[in-house]
């Protein structure tokens, strides 16, 4: 069995990479340097740090290990901080013993979080619970495994009398959802602010996944909090309740990226409508050219099993066909028995799904929704994709400084990979040469089809010389990575002086 697993690990290193990006949650099963190296080789593009669990020191150790693994493998990986957000949780229990609940049993829920719960009373962390729910409201616990129906509310004492609708065991500190209730909690808690400013910013994170975003103004607040760091950190919104769904367009407008977080969303809207919410959200993100991550339970059974269920394999493929930029693994990599196998399996499914897409048709659909008039840069990017599709090019090559041109090319979903050659800006005063940081390269790791590569360039070369040098470097790099071979056509997009040029080059 061990030999078989090792073989799988080796195969996954040699297969080609999918265009769809893979986000992996790092946790107890995957935070050692050797395991992170395996994940990087298997196809991890973004490492997710889930701040619902773990201390700053714990996450610091993990990110230090990630940097070491990146250094030893030479594989670039972006860092995502996922905020805990304004969660409501059940409290602690007497002697830490799980409580056995029976169907039809009545129980009191208190908002006094110091209470140690038992069969007759438990507590929840939301102070306004008794005010915001009403008789017949539903309270869901432990990812929806336990359902309570509210019978009566005592607002003065903060107590709700409830009936348990199913037999189940309740452990300590389980998450709580209140479907249809507009909850009076801030999007960013004090803990989130501390995590972002005292861990995220010093560690130069690339993106923040914001839990429970409810309106566009929430993102304005986060940008204010980040101040000068906002330009280097992408904000990815997670819509996880009905208020967020209602304000989706406003939220997307103010976000850099989006996550379809199906876990909490599945508690808030009827489970049979999740597929539609996913498709609509992904479609809207695609039209706006904003990267979108599909998350939650994608290969859930691989936490324990070396093979996913057929339904899971189909789910991953369908997310790719829907147009997702990234697919995400949570417990599968954080606490599962087969972290690297889960990544490799996901990569294989994505490659297979991508091979069935009608790319010219996708291009037409995005073009028909493109802004009028189009910005010169977007017009150029879409023309590069049209040229590459017609010329049956093996690769699109974009020389970029800030990465925005390459991202616009990715919006038009070419059938071939896009090599985004990030040429750091050389800033000079009379004493010193400095390069801008590599965050544009890491940011592009959440765009489908974008392959970033850093090119140091020669500080003293003229613009034309450095452009030619960067093009030669990029073509050589693409050949070694197997993105193109001798005789292939490559569409190159770059600047010459003040003009931008699209040209077709043949790989020598």
UniProtKB/Swiss-Prot annotation:
Residue sites binding substrate per the record: 48, 263-264, 296
GO biological process: glycolytic process
Gene3D superfamilies referenced in this protein's UniProt entry, alphabetically: Phosphoenolpyruvate-binding domains, PK beta-barrel domain-like, Pyruvate kinase, C-terminal domain
Keywords attached to this entry: ATP-binding, Cytoplasm, Glycolysis, Kinase, Magnesium, Metal-binding, Nucleotide-binding, Potassium, Pyruvate, Transferase
Binding site for ATP: 50-53, 89, 174
The keyword DNA damage appears for this protein: no
GO molecular function, one term: ATP binding
GO cellular component, one term: cytoplasm
Cofactor(s) this protein cannot do without: Mg(2+); K(+)
Binding residue positions for Mg(2+): 240, 264
First-tier enzyme category under EC: transferase
Reaction(s) catalysed by this chain's protein: pyruvate + ATP = phosphoenolpyruvate + ADP + H(+)
Residues reported in the UniProt entry to bind K(+): 50, 52, 82-83
Coiled-coil blocks: none
Pathway entry: Carbohydrate degradation; glycolysis; pyruvate from D-glyceraldehyde 3-phosphate: step 5/5
EC id: 2.7.1.40
Family: Belongs to the pyruvate kinase family.
Assembly description: Homotetramer.
Protein name: Pyruvate kinase, cytosolic isozyme
